[in-house]
Amino acid sequence: MGLSDGEWQLVLNIWGKVEADLAGHGQDVLIRLFKGHPETLEKFDKFKHLKTEAEMKASEDLKKHGNTVLTALGGILKKKGHHEAELKPLAQSHATKHKIPIKYLEFISEAIIHVLHSRHPGDFGADAQAAMNKALELFRKDIAAKYKELGFHG
């Protein structure tokens, strides 16, 4: 399940491009998530009123939250699987406060892959996509284990 050094390098190479515009990438990821899986929008009280893509694109709050999401994910990815300290508070808040099901983390992972491929097609080929998928799967597996420890079966 772990990633090789080469796979981590592919993940971190593309992540460097994401960090050049975290808010923009994050906004695109959330829009893709909400459009593809409208039920996920119900978990976000401050975004429920956003019904169209144009409204989502115009929302500074959505952009800020996208930045927050991808900043946290970047911190986790940079740990190359040694992310226990970063994962614990994230799992705690997502399990007990926000009640985000693991399925929704799968949905946002799909959105991340889609956005990276659409924004960086020349830098996010099959090998990089496979490596990122593997890294996101590792993240989901580890957060699911934390959820279980917390008694959340989402």
Swiss-Prot record:
Binding site for nitrite: 65
Enzyme class, broadest EC rank: oxidoreductase
A single cellular component GO annotation: sarcoplasm
Chain positions with Phosphothreonine modification: 68
Record EC number: 1.7.-.-, 1.11.1.-
Annotated S-S bridges: none
CDD domains xrefs: Mb
Positions contributing to O2 binding: 65
Binding site for heme b: 94
Compartment(s): Cytoplasm, Sarcoplasm
Described purpose of this protein according to its UniProt entry: Monomeric heme protein which primary function is to store oxygen and facilitate its diffusion within muscle tissues. Reversibly binds oxygen through a pentacoordinated heme iron and enables its timely and efficient release as needed during periods of heightened demand. Depending on the oxidative conditions of tissues and cells, and in addition to its ability to bind oxygen, it also has a nitrite reductase activity whereby it regulates the production of bioactive nitric oxide.
Similarity field: Belongs to the globin family.
Assembly: Monomeric.
Protein name: Myoglobin
